[in-house]
Structures are given as C-alpha cells and as structure tokens.
Amino acid sequence: MSGAFRLRCRGVDIDAGRPLVMGVVNATPDSFSDGAEMANRPAQFARVDELVAAGADILDIGGQSAITGVPEISVDEEIERITPVVERAVAAGAIVSVDTYRAEVADAALSLGAHIINDISALKDPRMADVLAARDAGYVLMHNPGRPKVRLTETNLYDDVVDAVVEFWTEGLDRLRSAGVADEAVILDFGPDFAKTPHQTLQCLREWERLAGFRRPLLMALSRKDFIGTALRLVPRERDEATLAAMVWIASKVPSVIARTHRPLELRQAFDMLGFLDGRADLHPDDRLDPSLRRQGVTPST
C-alpha cells in the first residue's frame, strides 16, 4: 500500500493508490438524480446489494438531498432514513460513507458501523471535528464557502477558483489536525458545482496538479453534474456516458482518485481496463480470449 495514499478509517486500511469507486445510495425521495426511484426501503436495499455486487469500493449513503429550495428535514428524520440502509451496507461488509453535514447524524451513523463522513458543509457544524476524532472516522473535506441548502448565485466569488480551493483545504486540514483527526483519515473534494459556475468546475479539473499536491485521495463527485449538462446540453439521466469519460480522464492523471458515481459497474470496468493500460495490471503473452466470450448471444448450431 502506498504510504502517501494510505486511507485509514475506523481502524480499516484502504488502498487508495488505485482508482476507487464510490457508489451512491440516495435514501431520500428528493434527490436531483434518482429520488423518485429510491423513495422506498426495498429499492434502497436493492441498490446496496447492486453496488456491492458491482464491485463498488465504498457506498455513500445520504438521507437528505443537497437540493436548494427544498426544506431541511429534522435530525431525527435524517437518522431514521439512513439507519436501515447503513445497517444493510455494514452487514454486507461494505466500506460505508454517510453524506451528512450534521454532527448528530454523523455520530449516529458511525455508531452503526459507518466508516466515513462525507460533509458538504466543510465543518460548518462546530461539533463535527470532535465526533470524527472520537470515532476515529474518515472524513471528506469539501470546498464549499456557502451553507448547506443555500445556493450561492454570485459568479465573481473568486479571483482564482483553484487558489480558493487550495486555501480552503489548507485551513480545513489545520482545523481537523487541531481536533485530533489524522491526515490519513482525510479525503479532499473540490466540490464540483458547489458555489462554482460550470466554467469554474472545469477549471478545477484542468488544474488537477495543484489539487493533487496535497498528497491525499481526491474525491471526484462528477456524476451527472451541471458542468456536464451545460457542456453537452443534457438532463441528469443522460449524462452517464460523459461522466464516465470525465472520470477515466481524471483517474488517468491524479495518483489517488475516489470516483463517486451512479453507475458503478461501468466505472469499475473502466478503471480495471485503465489498470491494464497504465501497467498496474498485465496480460501474459500466452493469454487468449475464451471462445465463449468471442460473440454475444450466439447459440451453437446443431
């Protein structure tokens, strides 16, 4: 395991020196992407099982949508939404991330066996860092100068958006260290679409080398995001192929990537193929294609 990209959460070591797949489980009826499909418990459980079978390295479970203009739910309701889903994922042996910005919800999730807290607010809850330290939890530190559920509409927030991300991460890491959270528990996320125009999100991706300088795994939450829809004029459910292209491109460049996706099987296969292309995996000179894999759906003649 590469020491520089060692990720340790709740006593579990995760090899982040290769591209990892984070599959999304929305335990909420109002997700921008698939809320209607995931509004009931059987669908959420089926999604957990699907992600595990598809080879997702991490499952990211959220009980409250980040959509602005939708009222914030209570802490109790958020905990009620995620509890059975977290229990299902933990029982399946998955590494579990919970998407919440509230320390009370984070503590409840970690008590159920979750490993990572994915916080879109970047420690806006003053109790969050102490919860992380007490539970020895992993943490996603996302660049977001705004508050949860509030859309920042200004387009001139930054002289240089990448400079702003770097400064924000530096300050956040200092706060986490002061609370007793080790660097090896931290994942960094530049926050695509959050307080950013589509152009600014694209700029962060193009200047990936500056973001990779922290030598921490980078969460790339690019799946179905606005910058893709803006570039190609597509609604969320039509953005999966373009998402795959963006994910493979960034994974071919950044040394340690965790890709958050709604389509884990395709991304897992793409990352595995990337491993053959960049030399992390290889074929033996005598390897040949199994004849049963040569054609699709052909039945032998009699």
Which functions belong to the PLM regions below?
Residues S2, L7-C9, A16, S33-R47, ...:
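Active-site-adjacent loop and "lid" segments of alpha/beta metabolic enzymes
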Residues G17-V24, E50-G62:
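N-terminal glycine-rich anion-binding loops that anchor highly charged ligand groups
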Residues M22, A56, I95, H115, ...:
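Hydrophobic "anchor" residues on beta-strands that sit immediately upstream
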Residues A53, A94, T170-A185:
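Phosphate/pyrophosphate-binding loops at sites that engage ATP/ADP/AMP, CoA/4′-phosphopantetheine
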